[in-house]
């Protein structure tokens, strides 16, 4: 391995300040295929007036409702979705972020909409009343979320005077929209913080720095001028005498630090990286070897103005908090003297991370000035941080006794074996390897996935995303990223899959926290679609491999690397499948499947596969999804106010293309949610007749232009096309099929959808009521 990996030179960065005071970062990277904007406002939930909890979060929601210039059908969210991009926002304790990513051709129009919605919000009382109900639905879901409850219990150990102990989510009762005092507070907060001097904007993409600067000057000038507002300092994190509130030490250890110096964010990122390293001789490996934990993850729960809450999240096997704390503090003392030896490896890892980052990640990185190295100032901050991280900084914990009773022989992690010096223009590739099993084996999959976890992290650091998934009777390994380390990564993965550790499966991983209902349904959608009978599970991995068949699909490999890959794949367990993959059978009619949930909320997914796997049907189904995405959201979320989780789009499962609709609601039953979705689908013909189809086809077709598609998205489309029996140039075939569609043919497709010609699968958090007819609807 080379001693030092050169920093990638493809990205150029320029920082400027506009005349109105807006701070702008411009990032050009020639390898990018999309462009992104990330805008941060230095104000968050803790800056809102105490009398109106949730005001900052509420305001974030209001911006997305459209402006006088860009109404609901043309606002930022609708525009980005129509062009196949991504858009979101987030309100944190002291910051609020708005961001989107789009193809380069649509980026300027997206930026125009972002700046317009923040500079000229409509904020009518009618809009506020409607959006308050959405926020209230979000609040109900948040209140029932296990992770949210866990965090509330964790923060109970913090000083009651600190804003972290306050209520900031906002709901129907804290947001008194008709009250003139609330309206004045909303306007005051907006005018105080949503001005240029309080904002930072980053634009990233393949455009030249000059082009990006022109865009920033044109649209950033919309913001009102102002002066930087100093956000008020919070109370101390720790109350003296120490709080009597004890946290669950089987799940968390919490450190509170104060008065950390500049660049403490670099120090925290550096420390957390090495705390979370799972290599032998480190903290995690030692705790697992001793049977004390299943997993550990260190992350900053809160950082602002020199304060830090460092959360050590645990999955402990047994009551062993005292031993775990002793070993943690022992490792910190070891790290205090040894960390300088890890700086070079850390710089290499961060360089590789940025080298592989997409447009949106780069925009976030430079907008938020996230750490990517340990500078001299960062090293000074790390020394101070490690001085504070003693037993005295633990809050909500019992005193630590016998600090030296369970010491370990610590050692530094070995360098990443896949992190070799790679040329700046190293190409990307993708590999898909799928096994078909006689029946689903969730327990064995969990054991193997746990075994792959350290490799997944090493591969990620080297620029390769490795996932091991299970759906239906299939197991699948997927690799995306830099081509150079990919063969070595798959060799290591196959070795771990073939030679799993013997013995019982009791340590195959700990059950994860329950998901909100709609996420739970999404997680198991493919299983409900593919599995029609009870699985015959076994603990005999050798037998499972013996009776499995596998296929592979690769893209982006040159002749030499393809030869190396083929040699590596010869070690794949199971039998290579020589015939073409079999598509899941079409099941006519509508069938209801339930996925039990303990939540009081209800959720429903409706998956509607195309009747055939032809390119023509896929193109028509994709155009339907494109047309209905914004109207579906408008109808169910805005007009009917069913809940905050409302979405639709294309979903592909094992080569089958289908429309997917999803809703979660705190007020409607599963039956009612399905009926709302069904009613919307029934109105599709009217929507098609009023649509500007040539323009919609043009916009959708542009999304399949290789110049606009990230490499992983291209690879995913071609993998699904391979499973469906199609071969090369599938994107171009889709574009041709789209160009042949017109109102008449799309109406015929809509009628196929309404008639459930490809079947409908309804997956819900509750069983179907006898009152819900699942026969074909009348048209």
Swiss-Prot record:
- State the EC number(s): 3.4.24.-
List the catalytic residues: 60 (proton acceptor)
Provide the alphabetized UniProt keywords.
Hydrolase, Metal-binding, Metalloprotease, PQQ biosynthesis, Protease, Zinc
**Which residues does the annotation say bind Zn(2+)?**
57, 61, 138
Q: What cystine pairs are annotated?
A: none
Gene Ontology terms: cellular component = cytoplasm
Q: Which GO terms describe its molecular function?
A: metalloendopeptidase activity; zinc ion binding
Cofactor comment text = Binds 1 zinc ion per subunit.
Pathway involvement of the protein, from the record: Cofactor biosynthesis; pyrroloquinoline quinone biosynthesis
Q: Which family does it belong to?
A: Belongs to the peptidase M16 family.
**What role is this protein assigned?**
Required for coenzyme pyrroloquinoline quinone (PQQ) biosynthesis. It is thought that this protein is a protease that cleaves peptides bond in a small peptide (gene pqqA), providing the glutamate and tyrosine residues which are necessary for the synthesis of PQQ.
Q: Which NCBIfam families match?
A: PQQ_syn_pqqF (TIGR02110)
What this protein is called in its record is Coenzyme PQQ synthesis protein F
Q: Which organism is it from?
A: Pseudomonas syringae pv. tomato (strain ATCC BAA-871 / DC3000)
Lineage here is:
Bacteria, Pseudomonadati, Pseudomonadota, Gammaproteobacteria, Pseudomonadales
This protein's gene is called: pqqF
């Amino acid at each position: 391995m080379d001693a030092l990996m050169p920093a990638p030179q493809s990205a150029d960065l320029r920082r400027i300040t506009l005349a109105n005071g807006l701070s702008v970062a411009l990032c050009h990277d020639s390898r990018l295929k999309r462009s992104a904007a990330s805008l941060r406002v230095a104000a968050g939930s803790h800056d809102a007036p105490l009398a109106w909890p949730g005001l900052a979060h509420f305001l974030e929601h209001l911006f997305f409702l459209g402006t006088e210039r860009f109404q609901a059908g043309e606002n930022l969210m609708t525009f980005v979705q129509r062009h196949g991009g991504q858009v979101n926002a987030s309100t944190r304790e002291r910051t609020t972020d708005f961001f989107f990513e789009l193809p380069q051709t649509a980026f300027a129009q997206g930026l125009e909409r972002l700046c317009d919605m923040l500079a000229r919000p409509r904020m009518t009382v009618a809009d506020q009343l409607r959006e308050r109900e959405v926020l209230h639905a979000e609040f109900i879901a948040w209140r029932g979320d296990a992770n949210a409850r866990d965090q509330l219990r964790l923060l109970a150990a913090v000083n009651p005077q600190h804003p972290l102990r306050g209520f900031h989510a906002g709901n129907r009762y804290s947001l008194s929209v008709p009250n003139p005092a609330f309206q004045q507070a909303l306007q005051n907060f907006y005018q105080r913080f949503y001005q240029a001097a309080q904002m930072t904007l980053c634009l990233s993409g393949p455009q030249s720095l000059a082009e990006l600067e022109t865009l920033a000057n044109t649209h950033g000038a919309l913001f009102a001028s102002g002066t930087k507002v100093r956000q008020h300092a919070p109370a101390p994190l720790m109350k003296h005498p120490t709080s009597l509130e004890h946290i669950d030490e089987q799940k968390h250890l919490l450190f509170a630090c104060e008065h950390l110096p500049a660049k403490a964010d670099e120090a925290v990122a550096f420390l957390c990286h090495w705390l979370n390293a799972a290599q032998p001789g480190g903290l995690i490996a030692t705790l697992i070897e001793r049977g004390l934990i299943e997993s550990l993850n260190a992350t900053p729960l809160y950082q602002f103005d020199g304060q830090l809450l460092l959360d050590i999240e645990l999955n402990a096997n047994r009551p062993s908090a005292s031993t775990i704390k002793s070993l943690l503090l022992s490792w910190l003392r070891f790290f205090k003297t040894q960390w300088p030896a890890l700086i070079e490896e850390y710089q290499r890892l961060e360089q590789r991370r940025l080298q592989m980052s997409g447009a949106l990640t780069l925009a976030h990185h430079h907008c938020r000035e996230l750490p990517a190295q340990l500078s001299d100032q960062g090293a000074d901050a790390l020394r101070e941080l490690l001085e504070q991280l003693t037993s005295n900084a633990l809050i909500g914990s019992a005193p630590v006794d016998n600090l030296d009773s369970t010491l370990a022989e610590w050692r530094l992690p070995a360098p990443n074996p896949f992190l070799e010096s790679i040329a700046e223009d190293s190409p990307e590739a993708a590999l898909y390897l799928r096994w078909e099993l006689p029946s689903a084996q969730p327990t064995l999959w969990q054991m193997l996935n746990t075994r792959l976890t350290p490799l997944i992290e090493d591969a990620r650091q080297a620029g390769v995303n490795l996932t091991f998934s299970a759906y239906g009777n299939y197991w699948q390994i997927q690799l995306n990223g830099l081509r150079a380390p990919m063969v070595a990564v798959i060799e290591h993965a196959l070795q771990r899959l073939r030679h799993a550790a013997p013995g019982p499966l009791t340590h195959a991983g700990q059950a994860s926290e329950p998901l909100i209902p709609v996420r739970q349904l999404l997680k198991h959608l493919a299983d409900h679609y593919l599995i029609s009978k009870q699985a015959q599970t076994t603990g005999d991995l050798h037998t499972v491999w013996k009776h499995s068949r596998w296929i592979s699909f690769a893209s982006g490999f040159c002749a030499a690397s393809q030869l190396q890959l083929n040699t590596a794949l010869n070690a794949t367990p199971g039998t290579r499948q020589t015939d073409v993959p079999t598509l899941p059978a079409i099941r006519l009619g509508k069938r209801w499947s339930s996925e039990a949930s303990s939540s009081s909320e209800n959720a429903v997914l409706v998956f509607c596969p195309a009747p055939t796997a032809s390119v023509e049907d896929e193109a028509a189904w994709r155009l339907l999804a494109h047309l209905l995405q914004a109207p579906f959201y408008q109808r169910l979320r805005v007009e009917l106010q069913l809940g905050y989780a409302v979405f639709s789009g294309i979903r592909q499962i094992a080569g089958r293309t289908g429309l997917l609709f999803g809703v979660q609601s705190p007020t409607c039953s599963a039956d009612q949610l399905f009926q709302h979705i069904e009613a919307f689908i029934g109105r599709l013909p009217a929507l098609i007749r009023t649509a500007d189809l040539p323009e919609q086809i043009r916009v959708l077709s542009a999304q399949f232009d290789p110049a606009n598609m990230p490499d992983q998205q291209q690879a995913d489309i071609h993998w699904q096309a391979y499973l469906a029996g199609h071969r090369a140039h599938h994107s171009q075939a889709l574009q041709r099929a789209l160009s042949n569609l017109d109102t008449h043919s799309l109406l015929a497709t809509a009628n196929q959808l309404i008639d459930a010609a490809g079947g409908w699968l309804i997956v819900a958090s509750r069983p179907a009521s006898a009152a819900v007819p699942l026969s074909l609807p009348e048209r």
